[in-house]
Amino acid sequence: MKESQSLQEKYAPNNTCWGCGPANPDGLHTRSFPKNGEVVAEWKPERKYEAFEGVLNGGVIGTLLDCHCNWTAAYHLMKHANEDHPPCTVTAEYEIKLLRPTPTNDSVFLSARVVDLTDDRATVEGTLTAGGKVCATCRGVFVAVKEGHPAYHRW
């Protein structure tokens, strides 16, 4: 992807989340970009994230999809409210389906879209694709937190 600044870098440059925080030196650094009504990302696996040789660990897959879908929700909640900055959102519920082994020899691609939206929550469906095949899908509910919640100021 050629986009210069991801949602994470633009709106939460000091975020230390292991999955998507730009400020976490040991993190996965998921970089999500709005595109044609969806949010997309490309991520290159490293061997240290393998479950076994050549196959990405399922927990890492879950983290990638969770963070990417969370940012999809935050972005769309921001647009829905006509705000300049996304609300801090957290995962309220989340389901992932691992459909096939995810190879680590090339980039994986994430895509997510909102399927239901209210003022403070979004239901998001996402996919992780590798080698031209969908390897995992997810569906989650992500909620904008209110002041007083531990995650309120994380962005």
Where would I find each of the regions flagged by the language model?
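Active-site helix/loop of acyl-thioester processing domains in fatty-acid/polyketide metabolism
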Residues: N36-E38, L56-D84
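HotDog/MaoC-like acyl-thioester-processing domains
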Residues: M1-Q8, T102-F109, R113-W155
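Conserved beta-strand residues within beta-sheet cores
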Residues: D26-H29, E42, T91-E95, F109-S111, ...
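Non-catalytic linker/capping segments at the edges of enzyme domains
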Residues: M1-A51
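Short histidine-centered beta-strand/loop micro-motifs
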Residues: F52-V55, D106
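Hydrophobic residues in beta-strands and at strand termini
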Residues: W43-P45, L98, A144
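Hydrophobic beta-strand-centered segment that forms part of the acyl-chain substrate-binding groove
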Residues: N70-F109
